[in-house]
Amino acid sequence: MEEFQAYLELDRSRQHDFLYPLIFREYIYALAYDHGLNSSILLENLGYENKYSLLIVKRLITRMYQQNHLIISANDSNKNPFWGYNKNLYSQIISEGFAVSVEIPFSLQLISSLEEAEIIRSYNLRSIHSIFPFFEEKFPYLNYVSDVRIPYPIHLEILVQTLRYWVKDASFFHLLRLFLYEYCNWNSLITQKKWISTFSKRNPRFFLFLYNFYVCEYESIFLFLRNKSSYLRLTSSGVLFERIYFYAKIEHFVEVFDKDFPSTLWFFKDPFIHYVRYQGKSILASKNTPFLMKKWKYYLIHLWQCHFFVWSQPGKIHINQLSEHSFYFLGYFSNVRLNPSVVRSQMLENSFIIENVMKKLDTIIPIIPIIRSLAKARFCNVLGHPISKPVWADSSDFDIIDRFLLICKNLSHYYNGSSKKKNLYRIKYILRLSCIKTLARKHKSTVRVFLKRLGSELLEEFFTEEEEILSLIFPRASSTFQRLYRGRIWYLDIFYFHQ
């Protein structure tokens, strides 16, 4: 029981009590528009300027209230419908100030926890490709998978309330609610989706912090239930989702069933359940029967409804067999297929044929959505036939080739983990031919004449680094080259793409 209390009680060192004064520091608004802001920069700049400037924020808030509400153009989409000012300048400045103010103490907490665990900060970063080797290792032994999309709160107040368990600063929350009320015009309990969408687009940093904190709060409860599931009875777990009385109910629940009903205490545990999330989408997979997967499904639904007041329809969370259905995650369609193999064994005069079936994870490129994206960017038509890019025809030959190469290499690096490379070859073909057609259009020539003049040197520019290395080590016709070239390659250094 002490272990539960130690896990569930909020660490007082994590409760930051004085965020309100940070709003009035001069350097906050300089840091807010530093796009390269990270934890190390925060640490370096915390002692930069200790002067308060109440006048700065007072002027911003005053100007927000002094905007002429009548001077609004119905056709001007860039104007704030409530404040009547182009691009929401003052609201964005204040929202960025809020974001930096709450980021600073939580960044300090993260760095201090890493230092206590003696973890180097740079090593804590993980590539998004590191998820797929985990899939390859674990998922062939699992049977069921559930594709779960974390629902958005219907009201921004829910996002604010999640901070109340960690930040004990009433003044900060009064100012925060005042700002959000003026921005979103909360006249009803439920805020329409368009206001959350507008708020997230115009204040991305602030909204992302609130949303990420909401996801962190949800996962902290969910992972607690996952790790301590052997203590939860199936028929009575619903009462555990009232956050205020969460700790007391856990304690009372365990004591009562331990002392009074030892014979009816029923443990359940699923040691083979796995949870993976990226942004707002998560994957839940298990080796056991679908019964336990259904229990976890309704745990999540009740958690969202009772604790975060977010409605999620049970019918939208499907539980599928990995061997029969594929799931979409991080740009890949993945499923588990049976890979039969036949081994012939001979002992003296007798020979035996042994059939062995192994499960293997398949990762497939979603070619149709990619072709739609390429068609939208005018690299091909909707059928996937390459076309020229007339917008780039005014650039130099080097710039045109470099742009196409950058896109091709980014897509090649990311989708080299595909188990079937046919779709990847098709994407490369579209980009190569689109590049050639763009160059031919610039020089007012045909594709055939242009290729005949340049030869095959232009096509070789589209070879990726690993293709060049393999071609130097092995002959192109060798079986080793073909096997390695068709194999899956995961790049564990991919964090973002060049824009």
Curated annotation (Swiss-Prot):
Principal localisation: plastid
Gene Ontology terms, MF aspect: RNA binding
KW RNA-binding (keyword) present: yes
One Gene Ontology cellular component annotation held by this UniProt entry: chloroplast
Localization: Plastid, Chloroplast
GO biological process: mRNA processing; RNA splicing; tRNA processing
Keyword flag Chloroplast: yes
Coiled coil regions, renumbered to chain: none
Keywords: Chloroplast, mRNA processing, Plastid, RNA-binding, tRNA processing
HAMAP family with a match to the protein in the record: MatK
Family: Belongs to the intron maturase 2 family. MatK subfamily.
Name by which UniProt lists this protein: Maturase K
Source organism per UniProt: Parkinsonia aculeata (Jerusalem thorn)
Gene: matK
